[in-house]
Amino acid sequence: MTETAASSFSPSLRVCRADYANPVHARALVQLLDSYAQDPAGGGKPLSDFAKTHLARELAARPQAFSVLAFDGDEAVGLVNCIEGFSTFACRPLVNIHDVAVLPDHRGRRIAEKMLALVDEISRERGACKLTLEVLQGNLGAVRLYERVGFAGYQLDPAMGQARFFQKWLD
């Protein structure tokens, strides 16, 4: 399983697991992530030159990382980056969906849904117990997508409320 056909999508749409050693895939990965980084939902700033130069190689060096790409013909139009983690409660792997990006002119065509279906398949093959992701509250289109494909807010006990996402920069 490396590629899926797109039956209800554009006949030229194909979704595949990225091969970080493939120059076409590596270039697509950087271009799509840079486009996403410049979007308000991605922070509004381009990737650093360091990230652009080293991203594919650094992901390839991490066996817990995998990415999914969407192509419309020869044009790269979508990306999902994933990092495998570990659920201590389930004592099984989990997969965190770290980035989901579709070029603005290609949104609304369920490309992200198709990519997430392949992420689900790869994650199950890895024995993952669940998928996790974080999304900005104001990114309503993404929230609707994630709910449509089965994601929900995370809580252990309703009395304790939903989990919140925090970060702390180390440099």
Indicate where each model-derived feature is located.
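Short coil/turn segments at alpha/beta junctions that flank glycine-rich nucleotide-binding fingerprints
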Residues: 93, 109, 125-129
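C-terminal "cap" of GNAT-fold acetyltransferases
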Residues: 3, 7-15, 127-171
